């Protein structure tokens, strides 16, 4: 939940002991990464600057995320993957916005290009998937909906942090013996518009196959639920279009 336990709240644990955050005063950290601010907002801006992503381009990406999400909702694409909670049976955050409305927002940092419009939504939610071994599949006579061909976990410089999908993709393709041309659909979390935009720039993967039903800019990514939420949406969309990977 992002409304009850805000992101970064765990970093306050040491304040009573005189530590404002886990990094300040750490000689090992400073010697390795310097004294740059550790912030997703800062990382998003660094990515936008490095890949020369203009504010207008990011706002256009954000607008398309909302359009795709609203279209998916209207067509009932999410209905199979959502378990209603009392009367709540659809995402509340996608909105009919415009480039003009987004242009009115102030940047998060003076002189920057990252605004609330190109950032993921603050939302609450939960998700889950059931992953079993081949042995359990046979033992319990289960019918699988998908098979994981390869799973990678790759880290990135913590100052940049949000660029990790780029090396993770390269590593996964290498280890699996696959090419991006083999992939039907991809979900790259839209923490900020600059994240999937930089990924698409580096991989040359088409936007038409990326976050096809909108992403976190429109739908949010509740803390602790993002991975399984994206996997669930990806699985349902692959089944809907008859895709394989």
Features from the language model and the residues they span:
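N-terminal extracellular/periplasmic Venus flytrap/periplasmic-binding protein-like
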Residues: 57-139, 202, 207-209
């Amino acid at each position: 939940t992002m409304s009850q336990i805000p992101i970064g709240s765990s970093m306050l644990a040491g304040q009573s002991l005189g530590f404002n955050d886990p990094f300040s005063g750490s000689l090992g950290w400073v010697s390795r990464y310097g004294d740059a601010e550790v912030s997703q907002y800062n990382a998003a801006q660094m990515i936008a600057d490095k890949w020369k992503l203009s504010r207008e381009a990011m706002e256009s990406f954000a607008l398309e995320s909302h359009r795709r999400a609203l279209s998916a909702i209207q067509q009932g694409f999410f209905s199979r993957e959502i378990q209603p909670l009392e009367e709540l049976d659809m995402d509340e955050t996608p909105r009919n916005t415009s480039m003009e409305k987004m242009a009115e927002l102030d940047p998060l940092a003076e002189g920057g290009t990252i605004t609330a419009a190109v950032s993921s939504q603050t939302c609450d939610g939960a998700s889950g998937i059931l992953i079993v071994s081949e042995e359990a599949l046979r033992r319990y006579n289960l019918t699988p909906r998908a098979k994981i061909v390869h799973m990678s976990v790759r880290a990135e410089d913590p100052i940049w942090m949000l660029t990790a999908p780029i090396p993770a993709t390269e590593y996964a393709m290498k280890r699996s013996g696959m090419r991006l041309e083999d992939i039907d659909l991809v979900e790259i979390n839209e923490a900020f518009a600059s994240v999937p935009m930089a990924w698409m720039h580096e991989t040359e993967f088409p936007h038409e196959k990326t976050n096809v039903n909108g992403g976190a800019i429109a739908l949010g990514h509740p803390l602790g639920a993002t991975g399984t939420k994206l996997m669930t949406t990806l699985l349902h969309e692959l089944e809907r279009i008859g895709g394989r990977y």
